[in-house]
């Protein structure tokens, strides 16, 4: 058993979680983060686990939502990212959203204080040297060009890429609350919430149609060197959605369902723009689903046509950057190791998962796998029935391009979802098969119940009833 540390390149969500898991297992870690020595197009600070896009970890409903289930599994596994998120949550309906600065600060302080973690602020411009016999590359979607080239050369394949976008953030005191109102969709109460966690900006039909046209006509930032790079459907720029059809937005991020105008409850809005709290103080709100590649001056002009935002002061305007990821199913084994170089693992968005939580989850697994090998043990893979296992299986075993479709790129970034889980047997109540919505709900409950039970068993944790009895 070697006493060499595990070297982790990248101090984002995946790298931070990987470092924490390995150190908690008793293995020394060197975490390499290039900021502030070298910055990126999206990062604004040198804090670890900085959230560069949304401040939302999405749904926290572990019974009905796949990402909520992943939250629960990560908490069971002692996730640093989830504990920091829980400690810095801000109201967001049924979602878990966080104060981005407080969250990053909490992660940074925890890692700096851990006796087995050393943080080195430096750029790693190539693949780890041979004497780094256990290493994890968790450089994320904004991997530095020199390292990206080294990865491409080592794998014999060009990195895949897609566009990702950032939504604007607005100062709360510049929002007209005589026009807007506080309400969560369907008054849903989430973690740390009240059922009135979003600011809603209503539009009538004429305002909506004019807004859609303004999005389409607005001047966009050009990225000619990235032509042919696809968008990730879960993070489409608002103007791209507008171009797909005049009704697309009001059935997407601007849907009015479940919302009643507190100032005029008898009149139903044709469309609604929602703003979500971005920091614990409640002084900043981000525009939900409003990722954009509009030029900055155009963003100010167009977004100030939204009722209630006529005098909006923007703390941050939207932007666009390119994400890179590798063809993981062909390059990585089940424990996230590069097949051509044992001991070198990849974690986070660079593996082809999408989302903060998913990236951290893959970092969690990579850290555990590397620590196990350092301790002379075989990595313990999570069951396919868990959210951990379903996501890992998608990354390392899903969507390999077939020989008869050589030109088709089938592996693309994906959020965790119930379609990645093994099916469950048809759920029956009193011997009768369920149908419609009841069937869907029962199926999800069966998947999540099975997942949590199998996750506890994988982690060596007692069942919930046993925990309760032990506490007594």
Swiss-Prot record:
Keywords (alphabetical) are: Cytoplasm, FAD, Flavoprotein, Methyltransferase, NAD, NADP, Transferase, tRNA processing
Its biological function?
Answer: Catalyzes the folate-dependent formation of 5-methyl-uridine at position 54 (M-5-U54) in all tRNAs.
The record's disulfide annotation reads none
Family per record: Belongs to the MnmG family. TrmFO subfamily.
One GO MF term attached to the UniProt entry: tRNA (uracil(54)-C5)-methyltransferase activity, 5,10-methylenetetrahydrofolate-dependent
What is one GO biological process annotated to this record? tRNA methylation
Question: Where does it localize?
Answer: Cytoplasm
InterPro entries of this UniProt entry?
FAD/NAD-bd_sf (IPR036188), MnmG-rel (IPR002218), MnmG-rel_CS (IPR020595), MnmG_N (IPR040131), TrmFO (IPR004417)
Instruction: Keyword check for Electron transport, yes or no.
Output: no
Q: Which GO terms describe its cellular component?
A: cytosol
Which amino acid positions bind FAD, per UniProt? Answer: 10-15
Which cofactors does this protein require? FAD
Name this polypeptide is given:
Methylenetetrahydrofolate--tRNA-(uracil-5-)-methyltransferase TrmFO
Spell out the reaction equation it catalyses.
uridine(54) in tRNA + (6R)-5,10-methylene-5,6,7,8-tetrahydrofolate + NADH + H(+) = 5-methyluridine(54) in tRNA + (6S)-5,6,7,8-tetrahydrofolate + NAD(+); uridine(54) in tRNA + (6R)-5,10-methylene-5,6,7,8-tetrahydrofolate + NADPH + H(+) = 5-methyluridine(54) in tRNA + (6S)-5,6,7,8-tetrahydrofolate + NADP(+)
* Pfam families in the cross-refs: GIDA
Chain ranges passing through the membrane: none
């Amino acid at each position: 058993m070697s006493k060499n540390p595990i070297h982790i390149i990248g101090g984002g969500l995946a790298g931070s979680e990987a470092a924490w898991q390995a150190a908690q297992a008793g293995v020394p870690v060197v975490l390499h983060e290039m900021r502030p020595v070298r910055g990126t197009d999206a990062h604004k600070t040198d804090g670890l686990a900085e959230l560069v896009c949304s401040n939302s970890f999405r749904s926290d409903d572990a019974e009905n939502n796949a990402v909520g289930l992943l939250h629960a599994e990560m908490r069971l596994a002692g996730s640093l990212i989830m504990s920091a998120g829980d400690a810095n949550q801000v109201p967001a309906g049924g979602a878990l959203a966080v104060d981005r600065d407080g969250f990053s600060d909490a992660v940074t302080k925890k890692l700096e204080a851990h006796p087995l973690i050393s943080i080195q602020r430096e750029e790693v411009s190539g693949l780890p040297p041979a004497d780094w016999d256990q290493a994890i590359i968790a450089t994320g979607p904004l991997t530095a060009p020199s390292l990206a080239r080294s990865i491409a050369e080592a794998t014999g394949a060009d990195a895949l890429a897609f566009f990702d976008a950032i939504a604007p953030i607005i100062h709360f005191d510049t929002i007209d609350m005589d026009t807007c109102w506080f309400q969560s969709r369907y008054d849903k109460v989430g973690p740390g919430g009240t059922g009135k966690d979003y600011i809603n900006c209503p539009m009538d039909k004429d305002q909506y149609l004019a807004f859609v046209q303004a999005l389409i006509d607005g001047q966009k930032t050009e990225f000619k060197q990235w032509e042919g790079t696809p968008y990730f459907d879960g993070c489409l720029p608002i103007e791209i959605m507008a171009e797909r059809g005049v009704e697309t937005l009001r059935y997407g991020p601007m849907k009015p369902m479940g919302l009643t105008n507190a100032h005029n409850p008898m009149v139903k809005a044709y469309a609604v723009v929602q703003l979500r709290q971005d920091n614990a103080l409640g002084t900043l709100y981000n525009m939900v689903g409003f990722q954009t590649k509009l030029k900055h001056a155009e963003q100010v002009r167009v977004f100030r046509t939204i009722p209630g935002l006529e005098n909006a002061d923007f703390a941050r305007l939207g932007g666009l950057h390119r994400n890179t990821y590798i063809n993981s199913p062909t390059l990585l084994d089940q424990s996230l190791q590069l097949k051509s170089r044992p001991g070198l693992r990849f974690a986070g968005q660079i593996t082809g998962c999408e989302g903060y939580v998913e990236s951290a989850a893959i970092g969690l697994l990579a850290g555990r796998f590397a620590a196990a090998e350092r301790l002379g043990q075989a990595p313990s893979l999570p069951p396919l029935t868990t959210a951990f296992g379903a996501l890992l299986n998608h990354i390392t075993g899903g969507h390999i391009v077939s020989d008869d479709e050589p030109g088709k790129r089938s592996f693309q970034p994906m959020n965790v979802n119930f379609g990645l889980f093994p099916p469950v047997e048809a759920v029956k109540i009193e011997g009768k098969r369920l149908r419609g919505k009841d069937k869907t709900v029962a199926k999800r409950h069966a998947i999540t119940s099975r997942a949590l039970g199998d996750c506890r068993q994988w982690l060596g944790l007692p069942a919930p009833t046993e925990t309760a009895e032990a506490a007594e």
